[in-house]
Amino acid sequence: MSAVPGPVYGLEVPPGEILIPAAMEFPASSLSVAGASFATPLVLPAGDLNSNQKILQFRITMAAVDPTEEPEADGEGNIPTVPRSTLRLVKRALPGLEDEDDEIDDEYMKALLAGSDDEEDSDEEANGGPSDPAKAKKQRQAAAIKKLLESAQEESDEEMEDAKPNGKAKGKAKATEESDDDEDEDSDDDSEEGADLENFVICTLDTERNYQQPLDITVNHGEKVFFVVTGSHTIYLTGNYIMDDDEDDEDSEDEDEYDLSPDELEYGLEGDDSDASDDLDGLEDPRVEEIDTDEEEAPKLVAANKGKNKRAAEEAAGLDELITKEDAKLSKKQQKKLKNNKGEAVAAEEKKDAKKVQFAKNLEQGPTGSTTEKPKQAKDSKPATGVKVVQGVTVDDRTVGNGRTVKSGDTVGVRYIGKLQNGKQFDANKKGKPFSFKAGKGQVIKGWDIGVIGMAIGGERRLTIPAHLAYGSRGLPGIPANSTLIFDVKLLEIK
């Protein structure tokens, strides 16, 4: 799975305490519940997605007001001397909870927003009264949303009193209106549910000096997030959808070699395309003999490297090995190699895979060149690995690649595994389309912009990135604030 930038995201948040859902699953109309208005964002056209893509999240990068727009008066009909608007974000305190009892299901959320439950539906429910624990919990959640909105308003107590439910969201609000005594009894529960909601001020914009504000807010698909604006002007949010591209690039030999185990690679080469398959049908025995030869020579190369460089044999763990260790489909023969040769067996297998790909490619050209070039390349290759600190990022070269190196402005494609210092993995790109970005241009965290400079194709690095060069004090889902991050990165291509 790999994340790629998608179409432009846009959302209009009008003033007047209107609660705007940022997600994409809600009905395409402006609705209201518990005295608070709701509206939906722009719906992504189906034509913008291909069959292999789905929305993972969206990233909001700009908030702006139109200074030429006529300001809206407040509830008393007054227009401030300096028109301004404040943007707030309302969200669940713990997004993505797995416990079904602690989250509002999608059907209920739609019903809550649409307010379309009629009295007949309410009468048909088996346990339709406040005594039903599930329904009472949902009523408390609706009341908590209402209370949060009322606390954000700067209107009088009488105006807030007018904002009580008035027949909207009938199926869920009707039981709340039945008895004021019931509301008093559940006040403690309402406060407890209200603790699940958080209200954050994002920015305040005016029409004289601060027309716009750059942001960097990423909202996961399905996360319950809303925006509210108080003031005189509409605030416009823009950004990009982030898509999941599961399309496998069958034409890339490097990707196939990287993703598959030796047995899977051999099978894939036999059936990858019709022309190659036809050529290999008559050469099955020589092909098997060549693979056996590689397996016999590989331990010799490992032994030679082990004698020259103990550090590479004892502690260097390449990205290929990390991915292989996580693969539950390893054969017994591969597991035996990993056990006897520690990390080096993986390097030997990688060279064997490369040999097989090269051999299959050269079958069409004839039996010249391939058998003599590979040992020479292995003999001349002398990786200069080591640990150094570059602008605060600790760079540990595990494998040095070949060819030209990455410079600022190059577009690169990489595989990576990201972990916290306690070893917990929070992100990875191990198969499918490589993760691509432009180095040194701010498209990724600062530590990556620094850490990939100087890598060559095929090279592997471990980047230890301090918090101030990663996500700082804000953190992300799965990444606590002020976390030092460790990335194992392999460079596949430079464009």
From Swiss-Prot:
Compositional bias of type Basic and acidic residues: which residue ranges?
373-382
Q: What class of enzyme is it?
A: isomerase
Query: Its catalytic activity?
Result: [protein]-peptidylproline (omega=180) = [protein]-peptidylproline (omega=0)
* Enzyme Commission number: 5.2.1.8
Q: Which SUPFAM superfamilies match?
A: FKBP-like (SSF54534)
Molecular-function annotations in GO = peptidyl-prolyl cis-trans isomerase activity
Q: What Pfam families does its record include?
A: FKBP_C, NPL
**Where found in the cell?**
Nucleus
Q: Where is this region: Disordered?
A: 115-198, 243-312, 333-385
Compositional bias of type Acidic residues: which residue ranges?
116-126, 152-161, 178-196, 243-283
How activity is controlled: the entry says: Inhibited by both FK506 and rapamycin.
Q: What is its main location?
A: nucleus
Keyword annotations from UniProtKB, A to Z = Chaperone, Isomerase, Nucleus, Rotamase
Cite the record's note on assembly.
Answer: Binds to histones H3 and H4.
Any idea what this protein is called? FK506-binding protein 4
- The organism named in the record is Gibberella zeae (strain ATCC MYA-4620 / CBS 123657 / FGSC 9075 / NRRL 31084 / PH-1)
Q: Quote the gene name from the UniProt entry.
A: FPR4
